[in-house]
Amino acid sequence: MRYHNITRDDMLNGDGLRVVLWVAGCSHCCKECQNPITWDPAGGLLFDDAAKQEIFEQLDKPYISGITFSGGDPLHAANRLDVRNLMAEIKEKYPDKTIWLYTGDSWENILHYAIMQYVDVLVDGEFQVDKKDVKLLWKGSSNQRVIDVQKSLRQTDPMVPVLHCGDYA
């Protein structure tokens, strides 16, 4: 896996103060994407032990709510296995921290992925410039959804996602 940045004390990409891992690799290539530099899966830096240690040092802080995986797309084929393994390690080491995941994929297409067992909140859907709204919380366009993954998976019909913010659209 490759990455472009690790952001500390982030308040824009999930609940509370978070650490954000911006991975390299995205096949969605959304028009007016905020991070087109992250599209190339060969771009950025190799995610090594030093990068993992930096994330763990942030997660050790009691005021950090959790980690957000963004990019790029953490579910890009070049990232999925490494992201899943890192999430599993984080859940084991930091069970009270939340994991957020941003992807251009839709919930309906990915809800059966093994990685979902580690995700608390998913922001799904491609950014659509014609639906851009800067007033939206945690997402860039109104087609995207902020989904409570674990509640959704426990439902009788997980295809209908439970939104993290209730009626918030």
Segments predicted by a language model, with ranges:
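N-terminal [4Fe-4S]-dependent radical SAM core
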Residues: 1-22, 35-41, 158-165
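Conserved Radical SAM active-site core
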Residues: 1-3, 17, 32-100, 105-112
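Flexible, glycine-rich phosphate/dinucleotide-binding loops
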Residues: 12, 108, 131, 155
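Short pre-active-site segment immediately N-terminal to redox-active cysteine/selenocysteine motifs
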Residues: 25-29
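Structural recognition of alpha->loop->beta junctions
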Residues: 53-56, 60, 111-131
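P-loop/Walker A phosphate-binding loop and immediately adjacent motor/lid segment at beta-alpha junctions
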Residues: 77-83, 87-91, 132-169
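Short, conserved loop/helix-junction motifs that constitute active-site signature segments
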Residues: 93, 114-117, 140
